UniProtKB/Swiss-Prot annotation:
It comes from Bifidobacterium longum (strain DJO10A). One of its GO terms (biological process) is 'de novo' pyrimidine nucleobase biosynthetic process. PROSITE patterns: GATASE_TYPE_1. It catalyses: hydrogencarbonate + L-glutamine + 2 ATP + H2O = carbamoyl phosphate + L-glutamate + 2 ADP + phosphate + 2 H(+). GO terms for molecular function: ATP binding; carbamoyl-phosphate synthase (glutamine-hydrolyzing) activity; glutaminase activity. L-glutamine binds at S61, G255, G257, F284, Q287, N325, G327, F328. Small subunit of the glutamine-dependent carbamoyl phosphate synthetase (CPSase). CPSase catalyzes the formation of carbamoyl phosphate from the ammonia moiety of glutamine, carbonate, and phosphate donated by ATP, constituting the first step of 2 biosynthetic pathways, one leading to arginine and/or urea and the other to pyrimidine nucleotides. The small subunit (glutamine amidotransferase) binds and cleaves glutamine to supply the large subunit with the substrate ammonia. Residues 207-405 form the Glutamine amidotransferase type-1 domain. Residues 1-203 are annotated as: CPSase. The gene is carA. SUPFAM superfamilies: Carbamoyl phosphate synthetase, small subunit N-terminal domain (SSF52021), Class I glutamine amidotransferase-like (SSF52317). The active site is at C283 (nucleophile), H378, E380. It is an enzyme of class 6 (ligase). This is Carbamoyl phosphate synthase small chain.
Length: 407
C-alpha cells in the first residue's frame, strides 16, 4: 500500500475484471483472479513451503483459512490424484504471487488453476505476497476476504462495490479464536487402514483407534507401514465405542479451530488416559493433551505453517526440520518436569519434550507417569521432511511396553 502526499493510505483503484483482497485492518491488494470467481472470507495465514501445495490445499486443518504461499512460483507440477491428504480442498481461499502458466510433471493430471476453479476455490494472484506476509508478521493474522467477478458488483445498482462494503463482509466473518471446527472436517463413519509394506497381508502388530479431528491421509499410512491396523473413527465417538475396538493405543489427530472449544474431546481424552491406553497426539491432538493435563492454550500472532521449521527434541538434543500447520500452542513451562495441573497432579509428571528454535513455542509434551506423549508438528511429512518419522516408532514402542491385560 502506498501513501499519498497528505500522508493517508491511498486506496488502489480496481475494476470488474480484477480480484481484490481486503484485510480486516483496511489494507487492500488488487490482483488477478485465480481459480474460481466469487467471494470468500476467512482468517488469512501464510505457508512457507516451496513445494507441497496440493497437500496444503487438502489439509483439513486449513478449514476456513485463506492461505498465502510465500514461495512466489506455484503450480509448476500441476495436480494429481495421488497427493491429496483428504477427499477435498479445505482452504477458504488461495493467494499466490506468480502462478505457473505451464504444467510440467510426469504425474500431472491437470493444472492447479483448473482444479481450484472446478472445486469453487476463490483465489488471487499477481500481488506482492512478500509485502503481504511482512504485514501479517507485524500485525498478526486476521480476517480477510477475496472478491472477484460478480462479488465486486452491487447487484442493486450495478456499480462496483466500495471498499467499505467489502470490508463489512470481512468483519462479519467469525474470528478463529473461539471457533469449534473439528466436527465439520471429521469423518462421519469409521474406516480401517490395514498394515501395509512389509506387513501387508499379515496379522497386525498393534491396533490403533485414531480419532479424526481433521486427520491427513498420510498419518494412518505411517502407522500401517509399521504393522498397525488403524481404525479411523469420527470425533463423535464415545469412550465405550473406543473400548469395543480393543485398541493397543489411541491417537488424536491434527485439526482446525480453537482447542479451548473442544470440551467433549478433552473429556474423551481424559477417559483414555484414565484407562491407561498408550496415547499419541499430533498438532490439535497435542493441544488437547495439554488441556487435558490442565495446561492452557493460546493463539499465536501468526502461527507456524510450512515444511521448514526447526524443532529441537529436548530428550535427545537432536534438531529436526519439520512440517507445521498450527495457529494455537500449549502454554507449559520449558526446561523442567512439573506436576500436570489437572486435579492436583492426577496424571503425574510431565515435561516439554520439543521446542521450536525460532520462537521457543512448545512443540511436544511427554508424560512421565502415564503412557502419553504428543507433538505440535507433523511427523507424517505430507508434504515435508522425514526427520520426525521416529515418533511413530516411539508410539509403537509405547504400545509394546504398555499393552493392556488380555491383549
Amino acid at each position: 500500500m502506498s501513501q499519498n502526499e497528505s500522508g493517508t493510505i491511498a486506496i488502489p483503484m480496481y475494476d470488474k475484471d480484477d480480484a481484490v483482497l481486503v484485510l480486516e485492518d483496511g489494507q487492500v491488494y488488487v490482483g488477478e483472479p485465480y481459480g474460481a470467481l466469487g467471494e470468500t472470507t476467512g482468517e488469512i495465514v501464510f505457508a512457507t513451503g516451496m513445494t507441497g501445495y496440493q497437500e496444503t490445499l487438502t489439509d483439513p486443518s486449513y478449514d476456513r483459512q485463506i492461505v498465502v504461499q510465500t514461495f512466489p512460483h506455484i503450480g509448476d507440477t500441476g495436480v494429481n490424484s495421488e497427493d491429496p491428504e483428504s477427499s477435498r480442498i479445505w482452504v477458504a481461499g488461495y493467494i499466490v504471487r506468480d502462478p505457473s502458466p505451464n504444467v510440467s510433471n510426469w504425474r500431472a493430471e491437470g493444472s492447479l488453476d483448473d482444479d481450484l476453479a472446478k472445486n469453487g476455490i476463490v483465489g488471487l494472484s499477481h500481488i506482492d505476497t512478500r509485502k503481504l506476509v511482512r504485514h501479517l508478521r507485524s500485525a498478526g493474522v486476521m480476517r480477510a476476504g477475496i472478491f472477484s467477478g460478480d462479488a465486486l458488483t452491487d447487484q442493486a445498482t450495478g456499480a462496483l462495490k466500495t471498499i467499505e462494503q467489502l470490508l463489512e463482509d470481512v468483519k462479519n466473518t467469525p474470528q478463529m479464536q473461539g471457533l469449534s471446527l473439528y466436527d465439520e472436517v471429521s469423518t462421519k463413519g469409521t474406516y480401517t487402514i490395514e498394515p501395509c509394506g512389509e506387513y501387508e497381508g499379515k496379522e497386525p502388530l498393534y491396533t490403533v483407534a485414531a480419532v479424526d479431528l481433521g486427520i491427513k491421509g498420510m498419518t494412518p499410512h505411517r502407522m500401517a507401514e509399521r504393522g498397525c491396523r488403524v481404525h479411523v473413527v469420527p470425533s463423535t465417538i464415545t469412550f465405550a465405542e473406543i473400548e469395543n475396538l480393543n485398541p493397543d493405543g489411541v491417537f488424536f489427530s491434527n485439526g482446525p479451530g480453537d482447542p479451548e472449544q473442544a470440551g467433549p474431546e478433552i473429556e474423551l481424552l481424559r477417559q483414555v488416559l484414565d484407562a491407561g491406553y498408550p496415547f499419541f497426539g499430533i498438532c490439535f491432538g497435542n493441544q488437547l493433551l495439554g488441556r487435558a493435563l490442565g495446561f492452557g492454550t493460546y493463539k499465536l500472532k501468526f502461527g507456524h505453517r510450512g515444511i521448514n521449521q526447526p524443532v529441537k527434541d529436548l530428550t535427545t538434543g537432536k534438531v529436526e526440520v519439520t512440517a507445521h500447520n498450527h495457529g494455537f500452542a500449549v502454554d507449559a513451562p520449558i526446561g523442567k518436569q512439573v506436576d500436570a495441573p489437572f486435579e492436583n497432579g492426577k496424571y503425574g509428571k510431565v515435561f516439554v519434550s520439543h521446542i521450536d528454535l525460532n520462537d521457543d513455542v512448545v512443540e511436544g509434551l511427554q508424560c512421565v507417569d502415564i503412557p502419553a506423549f504428543s507433538v505440535q508438528y507433523h511427523p507424517e511429512a505430507a508434504a515435508g521432511p522425514h526427520d520426525a518419522a521416529y515418533l511413530f516408532d516411539r508410539f509403537c514402542e509405547l504400545m509394546k511396553n504398555n499393552s493392556k491385560e488380555g491383549k
